[in-house]
Design a protein with these regions (language model features):
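Short catalytic/ligand-binding loop motif for oxyanion handling, primarily in non-cytosolic enzymes
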Residues: 23-26, 63-67
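Short, glycine-/aromatic-enriched active-site segment of Class I SAM-dependent methyltransferases
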Residues: 14-36, 40-46
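Short secondary-structure boundary/capping segments
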Residues: 6, 23, 112-114
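A short glycine-rich, Lys/Arg-flanked "PGG" loop and its adjoining helix->strand segment in the class I
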Residues: 1-13
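A C-terminal cap/extension of S-adenosyl-L-methionine-dependent methyltransferases
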Residues: 64-127
């Protein structure tokens, strides 16, 4: 955030989308080199402490969240994910089906914030 603060002009915009909830941390995070997961409040506090004002803050990936949480829970119990991450090629039809919830959420996010999800999104402005 320090570098964003340095390079952004005064009142410049910053859009952050990051992984949510430390308890969802898994081997997938290691494979995609994700080091941190945040709650909406923890990321918002970090944003505020680095000279930014939050304009919009929400969770995302809410519709598929129960499936993801269940998968991570089962994977952690049975130590399944140690071989692969979730970042693998997907069948085109399945990919399209899984894309539909993102379209629905993008429409919802125009008018409302989502209460939970596997990602946190914050739009902020530099002070």
């Amino acid at each position: 955030l320090n570098e964003f603060n340095r390079v952004l002009k005064k009142r410049g915009l910053l859009l952050i989308r990051s992984a949510a909830y430390k308890w969802l941390y898994s081997y997938h995070d290691i494979k995609v080199q994700n080091r941190r997961r945040y709650t909406l409040n923890s990321l918002n506090n970090l944003i505020k402490s680095n000279n930014f004002i939050s304009l919009k803050k929400t969770y995302a990936n809410t519709i598929l969240f129960p499936l993801l949480a269940f998968k991570r829970f089962v994977s952690n119990i049975f130590n399944i994910e140690r071989i692969n991450s979730d970042a693998l090629p997907v069948n085109r039809i399945l990919n399209f089906i899984l894309y539909i919830p993102f379209i629905i959420e993008s429409l919802i996010l125009r008018y409302a914030n989502l209460p939970f999800g596997s990602s946190v999104i914050i739009l902020a402005r530099k002070k």
